[in-house]
Amino acid sequence: MYHSNFQGDQTILSELDISAFYWINTHFQSRIFLKFMQLISIKQNFLWPGIVCLVIFLWLKKMRGLALVLATAISVSISDFLGATLKELIARDRPCHVLSHVEGIANCSNSFSFPSNHAINSFTFATIITRAYKNFAFILYISALLIGYSRVYLGVHYPTDVLSGALCGALIGYMGYKYFYLKILGLFKNKFPTLTNHELVETKISNH
């Protein structure tokens, strides 16, 4: 049984959360898997593919693509701000700062732990994109899950940090689709008559 170096943390963290953290953090430890987890955990490594994905949507789908790019940018900005704000309000220390025998630590940030911004941002992105284009659901949600898993595997977040981030991100992504994407697309419909009926029909179908 592992014990925390921080005497007061047992009043904050449940035994289940700590046990789940150690199970994920200590299983499947290998040099190759560690490198893979570090690779997908670097923000730039999933930021640029996301940008490329949105640019492709913009190029192929014209107005729908532009509406999706704008709505996604707004939604992810909101999720990132919310995550950073909650970190400061809740002020939960990262496991790599307060627990002993933590494996795989690459960079233990001085920022707080709850929630995981990696999780909240990646699930916001995955949800708003897949609401508009359901064919991308599998790859985007698998990617988001791997990113969240990597944060626990690398010892910088508890499972509940990632789970809460994922739930918040999914909610923000859904709200972003409903209140930003569809509203922006409706605005384009009124402002730009070149928006085709085919695009609008696709949008209505994907919304049901």
Range-by-range predicted roles:
Residues 1-49, 82-111, 191-208:
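N-terminal transmembrane-helix/juxtamembrane module of multi-pass inner/ER membrane proteins
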Residues 32, 63-68, 132-139:
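Membrane-helix interface segments
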Residues 43-46, 69-72, 135-142:
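Alpha-helical transmembrane segments
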Residues 51-82:
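Interfacial segments of alpha-helical transmembrane regions
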Residues 60-61, 90-91, 155-158:
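Short helix-capping/hinge motifs at transmembrane helix termini and TM-loop junctions
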Residues 73-87, 138-151:
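Small-polar-interrupted transmembrane alpha-helices in polytopic inner-membrane proteins
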Residues 78, 82, 86, 90, ...:
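Alpha-helical membrane-inserting segments
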Residues 102-208:
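Membrane-embedded catalytic cores of phosphoryl/pyrophosphoryl-handling enzymes
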